[in-house]
Amino acid sequence: MDITTTQFKRCDVIKAAGRVDSSTAPGLEEAMNAIIESGRFKIVFDMSEVNFMSSKGWWVLIETQKKCKRYKRGEIVLVAVREEIRSSLDMVGMGSYFRIFDDVTSAVGSF
C-alpha cells in the first residue's frame, strides 16, 4: 500500500492506494497519528485507489475518528469509497460514523 499526505491550510489529505489489511494498516495508523500529534485534527482520507479494507483498517479509521472528535477538535472524512467497501462499513453499523464525499475538493471544502 502506498500512502501520500498533503497538508492544506484547513486540513490534511491522506491518500492510500492498494489494500488496507493487517500488514499495511500499521503504516496508515502511523500516518494518521503523525498528523494528530502535530496538532491537526481535520483529516480527509482519499480512498479512490483503495481496493480492499480489512477490519484492521476500519479499526485504524475508527480510532482516528475518536481522537479527532475528542473535545470537538475535528474529524476524519472519507472520499471516493468504493461500493463494496462502503457496504462492509454499513454491514457493521458504522456507515453513519463517517461523512463520505465523492471528491477531495468537496471534502476539503467541508472544513
Predicted regions and their residues:
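Short acidic-hydrophobic, aromatic-tinged amphipathic segments that line or gate anion-handling sites
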Residues: 99-103
